[in-house]
């Protein structure tokens, strides 16, 4: 079975598993998590009893995760998104579904960042600092970090230098698009700098690791 067919079958199976959380149609935004990757994230939240989630890059997946947390009865999600249109849609959908008590979207435009590689931009430094600090102060250390933005792979590098200090021991770090060269470069650097061991599942395009104590 070739890789493309394997991925497509994995996505079809994931859509079936995700059906209980698909109460209504959600449009795909740019660079949305594939169904197989989203199902893997949902599994991690449930099996790992994750309760304090931060997501870099939001979309339909943010709404699905918020539905999961609301139905489970505990947990909170903070999503950071640079695209104003996407952030506005997700925030509006969360309000419309009454999910504002479990999930919040922050529109953080891209800007120069001291932790960025080369001339890459990341989310606005002060805005991210303020929002994440308030989130952690209210709900505790982050036990699941999902990195699916910004769009360009090496632009994602600052996520761990910036957020490592608010990760709980054993926190899950999940990175989408792990098969792309830029993401692989970032994963290698993170593994070396933060003593992480990433595992990549080709059918999901997701790399996962657990933060050390």
Region roles according to the model:
Residues 44-49, 71, 136-141, 166-167:
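Flexible, charged surface loops at secondary-structure boundaries
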Residues 31-112:
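SAM cofactor-binding core of SAM-dependent methyltransferases
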Residues 39-41, 129-135, 158-162:
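A generic local structural motif
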Residues 53, 79, 146, 174-175:
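Generic enzyme active-site microenvironment
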Residues 1-32:
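Rossmann-like AdoMet
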Residues 91-140:
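S-adenosyl-L-methionine
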Residues 31-35, 125-128, 153-156:
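A conditional alpha-helix N-cap/helix-loop micro-motif detector
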Residues 138-139, 143-144, 150-213:
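C-terminal substrate-binding/active-site "lid" region of AdoMet-derived donor-dependent transferases
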């Amino acid at each position: 079975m070739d890789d493309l067919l394997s991925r497509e079958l994995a996505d079809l199976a994931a859509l079936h598993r995700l059906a209980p959380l698909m109460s209504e149609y959600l449009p795909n935004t740019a660079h949305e998590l594939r169904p197989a990757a989203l199902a893997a994230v949902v599994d991690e939240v449930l099996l790992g009893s994750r309760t304090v989630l931060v997501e870099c890059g939001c979309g339909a997946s943010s709404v699905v995760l918020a539905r999961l947390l609301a139905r489970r009865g505990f947990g909170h999600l903070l999503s950071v998104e640079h695209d104003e249109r996407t952030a506005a849609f997700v925030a509006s959908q969360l309000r419309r579904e009454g999910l504002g008590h479990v999930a919040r979207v922050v529109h953080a435009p891209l800007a120069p960042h001291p932790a960025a590689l080369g001339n890459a931009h990341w989310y606005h430094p002060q805005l991210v600092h303020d929002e994440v600090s308030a989130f952690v102060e209210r709900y505790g250390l982050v036990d699941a970090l999902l990195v699916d933005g910004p769009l360009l792979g090496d632009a994602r590098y600052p996520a761990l230098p910036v957020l490592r200090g608010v990760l709980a021991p054993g926190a899950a770090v999940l990175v989408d698009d792990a098969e792309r060269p830029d993401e692989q470069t970032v994963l290698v650097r993170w593994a070396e700098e933060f003593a992480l061991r990433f595992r990549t599942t080709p059918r999901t395009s997701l790399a996962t690791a657990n933060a050390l104590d």
